[in-house]
């Protein structure tokens, strides 16, 4: 995958969002929350492997669970999945979601180039919404800056 097109908006102004979590109930509730906002096209995956297989769909943002082994103990965990995503396309922002309330886990995720780390809680969706808005605004400004730089 060459040349990440920041928020390419292939469905008018909708953000392509991948949700990756092995907890089907949490994944579905997150999907429902995001579906209530018309600016998202959502794809959900229960494993990191499925997410990697579908990176050709060019997600704008990936929200990725940290553990990912409840369906199959040999499944890739969130960090392994993050590393593979970054190997394919280092420009895709990946937000790690976890039940872990441990600063070392969050720091480890950042060392693996996660955009941010969010603890699963009642406020996780609101935090994710703010993070995605920040990503969107940053990519929009980056796109505008590149446009102006090309004309200089």
Give the predicted meaning of each segment:
Residues 127-140:
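Receiver (REC) domain switch/output surface
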Residues 55-57, 84-91, 112:
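Conserved phosphotransfer cores of two-component systems
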Residues 24-46:
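Two-component/phosphorelay signaling modules centered on CheY-like receiver
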Residues 44-61, 65-70:
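Acidic, metal-coordinating helix/loop segments flanking the phosphotransfer/catalytic sites
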Residues 1-18, 23-31, 145-152:
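Non-catalytic signal-transmission and effector/linker regions of two-component phosphorelay proteins
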Residues 46, 74, 110-130:
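Output/docking surface of receiver
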Residues 76, 80, 87, 100-118:
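Alpha4 helix (beta4-alpha4-beta5 surface) of REC/receiver domains from two-component response regulators
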């Amino acid at each position: 995958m060459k040349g990440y097109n920041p928020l390419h908006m292939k469905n008018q102004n909708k953000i392509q969002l991948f949700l990756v979590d092995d907890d089907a109930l949490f994944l579905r509730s997150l999907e429902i929350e995001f579906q209530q906002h018309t600016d998202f096209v959502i794809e959900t995956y229960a494993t990191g492997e499925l997410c990697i297989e579908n990176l050709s769909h060019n997600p704008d943002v990936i929200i990725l669970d940290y553990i990912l082994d409840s369906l199959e103990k040999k499944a890739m965990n969130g960090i392994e999945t993050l590393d593979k995503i970054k190997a394919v396309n280092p420009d895709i922002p990946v937000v790690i979601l976890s039940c872990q309330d441990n600063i070392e886990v969050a720091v480890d995720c950042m060392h693996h180039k996660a955009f941010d780390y969010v603890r699963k809680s009642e406020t996780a969706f609101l935090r994710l919404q703010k993070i995605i808005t920040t990503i969107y605004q940053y990519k929009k400004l980056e796109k505008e800056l590149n446009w102006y730089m090309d004309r200089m």
